[in-house]
């Protein structure tokens, strides 16, 4: 690999690089955004219908106080890991799966990119289903056709790259902030604060606090690994990055799940499909206005899902049941967090042990990368295994094991070399 120093401060002069949204090159400093616009983008990415699913999954079998604790612990872990991965993206200027190239090699990148692509497209399709269900109440068109039309609309900003997403997010941020506040206040008012805090379920879908925390982490597991896609456009300032990410996650992934629990109690159902259909009405008192706000929430999140999926695909080819929800979120919380842990270990932890990489961020072509970096891939695989078979909070166990093993395996490999 080349020892050439990278320069993310350079102004890119190739005409097609900006058109390609810097998929394979660092984002130059003069094309980056300040913390306010980054907050708008991050907030809008966080305000997602899936957050209601997180709330209903927790509330369906945990006392509200326990659900609140699980949500708090999970979000603290999420934001801590995300701050590190987004800082890596901001510092290098590279997209998530481009960074992964250096860490795990060519074959490892194929595996990681495929997982992210499938996950992101899955969430994209799920939210299109919600879009179709909501608007079918007001427009005499079938849900599948509405979903297709919604997909075309939401893809229209994603195909324009980060610039298109930033413009939509700037427009949508204030309405979505109001939506979160109204949803929380009105839903809690309808059920009552005392009733909310005294709520105790009859079921046992989630059960333990550890599984509840894993569910919270799993609901945003893909985000931990893909936030460099967004963070690479931020100016490198760890303090502002931290503030922006904490604030965005608080509004979208803390307050909205609480509103989801309160709404589910008021509607007397834990079907998050029903909750998502009516949360807009409960928040605004108007079906149409509520549907428009839900559409904005789905659109601003789905553009990022499609954006990350397309980035992941380029790295490969170079160019309603609540039990189901819990299983999916739990699986994501086991498999994907170690991917983020590999990135953190490689870029932030290994240098502490004297292992310094000479990565040339201006050249991420596969011909300059090893076919596979076994220490990194094995650390990830072992981290997933630890998460599956260990007791406690699986996502944390998997990430910690991955970081430790990544360091150990790389130190051993370096000694042999």
What is each of the regions a protein language model found here?
Residues 132, 145-150, 154-187, 201-203, ...:
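Membrane-interface loop-to-helix entry segments
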Residues 57-86, 101, 108-110, 250-253, ...:
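Extracellular loop-to-transmembrane helix junctions
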Residues 57-61, 86-87, 126, 130-138, ...:
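Membrane-water interface regions at transmembrane-helix termini and the short interhelical loops
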Residues 42, 112-117, 138-160, 174-185, ...:
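Transmembrane alpha-helical segments of multi-pass small-molecule transport proteins
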Residues 109-140, 299-315, 329-330, 338:
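Hydrophobic transmembrane alpha-helices that form the core helical bundles
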Residues 1-60, 64-65, 164, 181, ...:
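Membrane-interface "cap" regions at the ends of multi-pass membrane proteins
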